[in-house]
A protein has these predicted regions:
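Conserved beta-loop-beta/alpha segment of the NTase-like Rossmann-fold superfamily
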Residues: 71-75, 82, 88-177
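N-terminal glycine-rich phosphate-binding loop and ensuing alpha1 helix
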Residues: 2-81, 98, 103, 139-146
Length: 178
């Protein structure tokens, strides 16, 4: 069973400048949550228990978001704002661990995943890219859950790809699916 996820978050966010100049792109809001939280929520829903962020300096806001914030929690409790207090306290379930590993230098996505190898060990794991959010069409089975199920049944590596226009090929990693 896949219980670990590696989430590379060490990028510079150049595709979303100027929005990412002062805020990590993974922390940009999608309605009322940062994008990284949506990615981690999908991972948790799929059964992931160990989340490994591969990060760099300047990305501390990501780790801070998933940490306890006692001052905010105390203030919300004092004001009786229980609904928002619960949402703040439940950002990361108690049975899920989150760790951060630094990528010492920018050598690309493959290197970022390699930086997590000691934490992953010899276990199967998922790599989640937090700058691409995919909405579930049927509203029930999320892509990661389906990929983990396929991996468990087939014992074969799973890769999700998306078609892009020819003029956008230089912006993405490319897979030839022919």
């Amino acid at each position: 069973m896949v219980r670990k996820a590696v989430i590379p978050v060490a990028g510079l966010g150049t595709r979303v400048l100027p929005a990412s100049k002062a805020i990590p792109k993974e922390m940009l809001p999608v309605v009322d949550k940062p994008a990284i939280q949506l990615v981690i929520e999908e991972a948790v829903q799929a059964g992931i228990k160990d989340i490994i962020l591969v990060t760099r300096s300047g990305k501390e806001a990501i780790e801070n978001h998933f940490d306890k914030h006692y001052e905010i929690e105390a203030e919300l409790a004092r004001k009786g704002k229980t609904a928002i207090l619960e949402s703040v306290q439940n950002i990361l379930p108690d049975d899920v661990t989150l760790m951060a590993i630094r990528q010492p230098e920018a050598k690309g996505l493959g290197h970022a995943v390699l930086c997590a190898s000691a934490a992953v060990g010899n276990e199967p794991f998922a790599v989640l890219l937090p700058d691409v959010l995919v909405d579930c069409e049927d509203g029930e089975v999320h892509d990661l859950s389906q990929m983990i199920e396929n991996f468990t049944q087939e014992s074969a590596t799973q890769v999700m790809v998306e078609r892009v226009a020819d003029e956008d090929i230089s912006k993405y990693g490319i897979a030839d699916c022919s």
